[in-house]
Amino acid sequence: MAKHTFQTEVNQLLDLMIHSLYSNKEIFLRELISNASDALEKLQYLTLTDENLKNLQYTPRIDIHFDEEKKILTLSDTGIGMNESDLVENLGTIAKSGTKSFVSRLSGDKKKDSALIGQFGVGFYAAFMVADKIVVTTKKAGEESAYAWLSEGKGDYEITPCSKESHGTEIKLFLKEEEKEFASRWRLEEIIKKYSDHIPFPIFLHYTQKKNDQEESKEEQVNKAFALWRISKNELKEEDYKEFYKSLSHDSHDPLAWVHIKVEGSQEYTTLFYLPSKAPFDLYRVDYRSGVKLYVKRVFITDDDKELLPSYLRFVRGIIDSEDLPLNVSREILQQNRILANIKSASTKKILAEIENLAKDEEKYEAFFKEFGRALKEGLYGDFENKEKLLELMRFHSSLSPNKKISLQSYKERMKEGQKAIYYLMGENADLLQNSPLLEKFKKREIEVLFFDEEIDSIVMPMVNQYGDLPLKAINSAEADKDFEEESVSEEEKERFKPLLERFEKALSGEIKSVRLSKRLVDSPACVVADEDDPNFAMIKMMRQMGNALGDFPEPKPILELNPEHPMVGKLLALEDEERASDYAHLLLDQAKLLESGSLKDAVGFAKRLNAMLERAI
């Protein structure tokens, strides 16, 4: 017998399960049946691809036994089974990044934490909501040894060798007194039909029935056990689709929409894709796994292939079932398979069309974009084939709509007469951008400016130069300035302020690229802008946060722009005290940086200079 200690995250999860206040405890059975179905699908695939298992004879099925008196519930399957190391990995640690994300959200407040269970499938551990002891007996297909895993969910578990005739897994739950309803026929039937009716393997419920004063053992297949996606959509109800989504995704929320398509002709395949209503915790993790399963002629092949859909649609849940791929197709072949590439391209277009359809309902789409907009934006970076469609789906805050995001089409429809470009400003958040000095001239002209205020915008939006026939221009760029040449700085002004510019460049040497006059300001004395060939400030900040020290390149220096019409700038021109002029130069630069990014690198220096200036003024 080997005693093991649970990983810390597992202990946290178990503590939540054991003391759970979550009312919908019946989901534990959905989770266990789903795991059993996964085990059967894995074995089905291996019997086609693994030489050692090709001749394996077995009947794929899930069996459920119960004993009302003893309060014992037993679930078994004829799937792949586990060996000792599988038991440690699957039941003793948390390998799934999503589960780790779930655990990291736990607050210690039992009521709040229990509510999280409904937003996330917690797999095997959900059984501890209803059981105070669990015994798992398992044998891996193709191996001789069998093992028993036992735990009461109190920090450790035991693994011991045991005997088991055939491959597969049996899970025995010793139910808590108050959960004995889960050892009754009517309750189990109800739960199976509610959550697992469309599991593609038969689920048999075993019970005893009195006949002529004799106890007679019976078994009854409770679920329909058919591939829902293969049924004509005309024969399916809305409720059928919703139930199947929940069993497929472990999501307790209803999906927002779905697309069910059967394609016939030179290629034959069926797809069923769902748009979830809530984003999973780990959607933006590097190791996030796709939610789409690939089948060939109803045989499960993989759910871990990044070639099934583009990565920006990784939030989509669903099924691809092909008639043309070979059953023993390998993952390496999948990556270069023309049939799958065609399915991927057609599926992407269908999903985007459904999202476009969803966008007709403004309220629904606002909620959807809040959850998945960031992922969709990633498509602008790599999916050039669908770039125009994706642009129609984008939503942004703006100077006229700081609280509600708008489409590019909405912006276009309310452009000022004679306006020939879409103007934007990039930064950290809409509140900061709304108060940017760079907006002043545009507000005066009543020209709307889009806010690219998410981290992802600084990467993807520079790739978007055009919307229809309209160019996109950053308002701090020379390109945007050319649109208003009638307000450019005169030669006379340049000559008049030349001494001040030289003095500032000397005082700020090493901190800026240059100092110049600008007509883009109205009420502010100064602002900072990036040189045209340099990355924008938002991108610089994001790269710094990601730990990327901008590669081998030094951090780009900003350009300081002064407003020649501002009284303060005029007074600085007349100031003869070099030390004070230097302090003012630094203060103006710091103030401009603060308004641009909301933070300063040298806050202490800024405070000292500000205090010195106040001291002189008092």
UniProtKB/Swiss-Prot annotation:
Location (main, coarse): cytoplasm
PROSITE patterns: HSP90 (PS00298)
InterPro entries named among the record's database cross-references: HATPase_C_sf (IPR036890), Heat_shock_protein_90_CS (IPR019805), HSP90_C (IPR037196), Hsp90_fam (IPR001404), Hsp90_N (IPR020575), Ribosomal_Su5_D2-typ_SF (IPR020568)
Gene3D superfamilies cross-referenced by the UniProt entry: 3.30.230.80, 3.40.50.11260, Heat shock protein 90, C-terminal domain, Histidine kinase-like ATPase, C-terminal domain
GO molecular function: ATP binding; ATP hydrolysis activity; ATP-dependent protein folding chaperone; unfolded protein binding
Location relative to the cell: Cytoplasm
GO cellular component annotations of the record: cytoplasm
Recorded superkingdom: Bacteria
Keyword set, alphabetical order: ATP-binding, Chaperone, Cytoplasm, Nucleotide-binding, Stress response
Pfam families named in the record: HATPase_c_3, HSP90
Region (C): 542-618
Region (A): 1-331
Assembly description: Homodimer.
Protein family: Belongs to the heat shock protein 90 family.
Record NCBIfam families: PRK05218.1
Function per UniProt: Molecular chaperone. Has ATPase activity.
Protein name, entry field: Chaperone protein HtpG
Organism of provenance: Wolinella succinogenes (strain ATCC 29543 / DSM 1740 / CCUG 13145 / JCM 31913 / LMG 7466 / NCTC 11488 / FDC 602W)
